[in-house]
Amino acid sequence: MSPSQQRYDFELISSWIPEGARVLDLGCGDGTLLAGLAATQRVVGYGVEIDPAGVLASVANGVDVIQLDLETGLSAFGDGAFDFVILSQTLQAMKNTEKVLGEMLRVGREGIVTFPNFGYWKHRLDIAMGHMPVSKTLPYQWYDTPNIHLCTVKDFEDLCAKVGAQILDERVITGGHQVNFMPNLLGDLAVFRFKRK
């Protein structure tokens, strides 16, 4: 992966996953995260992807992948089947985020979600200037975006409380650096680790 394509959320996720863990990567895209985890942490994992091109790319990357629409649920997987269920920069494209989080909590001991923080100051400034934000974490124009549910760090904390998820760790980053001061304002990417209460 080139430096311009580096996914800092992948680095953080990798630091949370122990060797040999059972991992389900929802919306796995080309399988880069899962392939990396298999190589470095020897995880046993599966990817779930709806896009046929993503499925083919995942297979080419050596990832076991299932073509499935996350909106229909994860009935193919039993309760507690995985140690970790990951949803990386996909939450904002889900129609029913509450249901998806509930399914993550059902099939996994822990969940990890990453998403672009809509509360980031540059996004707020773009809106104040009269247009929707376009950035590294929100790379689409308003008219061609798959993102339908944008949220802030605080919004996601509230959703976790609503669905009965206990937040174990949360990090907000900008340009690969953790933001500790006013993270909802100064961080452009949020990474949460949680489990069922």
Where are these regions (language model features)?
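Conserved alpha-helix/loop element of class I SAM-dependent methyltransferases that forms part
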Residues: S4-G20
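Class I SAM-dependent methyltransferase "Motif I" SAM/SAH-binding loop
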Residues: G27-G29
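Class I SAM-dependent methyltransferase SAM/SAH-binding core
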Residues: T32, G36-G73
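A short SAM/SAH-binding and catalytic strip from SAM-dependent methyltransferases
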Residues: F84-K95
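S-adenosyl-L-methionine-dependent methyltransferase catalytic module, highlighting the catalytic core
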Residues: E98-E103, E110-K197
